[in-house]
Amino acid sequence: MWSYILKRLLLMIPTLVGVLTLTFVVIQFVPGGPVEQAVQELRKGATEQGATSFGMRAHTGVDPQQIAQLKALYGFDKPPLERYWLMLERFARFDLGDSYFRHQSVWSLIVQKLPVSISIGLWTFFLTYLISVPLGIAKAVRNGSPFDVATSLVVLVGYAIPGFVLGVLLLVLFGGGSFWQLFPLRGLTSDNFAQLSVAGKVLDYLWHIALPITASVVGSFAVVTMLTKNAFLDEIRRQYVLTARAKGLGERTVLWKHVFRNAMLPLIVGFPAAFIGAFFTGSLLIETLFSLDGLGLLSYESVVRRDYPVVLGTLYLFTLIGLATKLISDLCYVWVDPRIQFENLER
């Protein structure tokens, strides 16, 4: 067991290096970096100053010495290979550097924004599984019934609607866009949150998070529900279930004591992808749409502004979380089904 865990931890290193290397290479060829943006601002300021002072267009060139200072400020005065090795050295120490534009360390920004993304990700993840797993089991037990057909139609329609489209629709309907002002447009708490009672704080938080979570969760039901249904149907048709029924065991006992554990294995394997999807991919769209100040919005703004330390830092963090949850998923796989050995997973 411990040898398997050690091997998996060691394999995380080349994966992280590969992700950082690919991102670093892409950054070298993306136009409009921080130096170019700063030069444009200087040219714009010089033009406006010249037009105001002299009534004519000013010279828009920038002193080469200023450009050299900007490159030194953002670390672009060194060759790419040297910058690459310095980046790997810093990330090996978990030093993510400082933001170009926010005048804070990347770690402090992540710590500030992380609670919002965790809140959205956990709500989405747990609500998806708490609703979809029982629904999938009910559909498997009632396979082919009107209930099965109706719920399949509902979850597939929800799956077909992108989360950001549903979010826009919810804002238009319930956020004061064109109809009812029932929910707030942005943020997770009200301005007077600190003055509210404990019950008032809980209700205020749920009031703010209702629309973002609805937009994030609805499209996630179909995959987990249908996976649960198909896994249970596959197990129900197996010989050991027929044997258990022949012995006189009740349907509930057969379903929960024998079928449930085996049918849950595919779902456990999908936990990391579902968690990371809810934690990052979903939060990126939902946070941007609802102006929630989390890691998703921070990542989006950093890409737009070419704030490379924040881009690399958040990508490094999400990759690390994804690899760790994948390892935890494998451990849960063995915990649910003791017949599976770590030696088999290694092969």
Residues of each region from the PLM?
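Short, membrane-interfacial amphipathic segments enriched in basic
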Residues: 1-3, 77-82, 93-107, 143, ...
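N-terminal signal-anchor/signal peptide hydrophobic helix marking the start
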Residues: 6-12, 16
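Residue-level signal for discrete positions within transmembrane alpha-helices
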Residues: 12, 113, 117, 153-156, ...
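Hydrophobic alpha-helical transmembrane segments of membrane transport/permease proteins
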Residues: 16-82, 178-201
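Membrane-water interface segments at the C-terminal ends of transmembrane alpha-helices
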Residues: 23-29, 68, 153-186, 215-221
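An internal, D/E-rich "acidic patch" concept
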Residues: 71-133
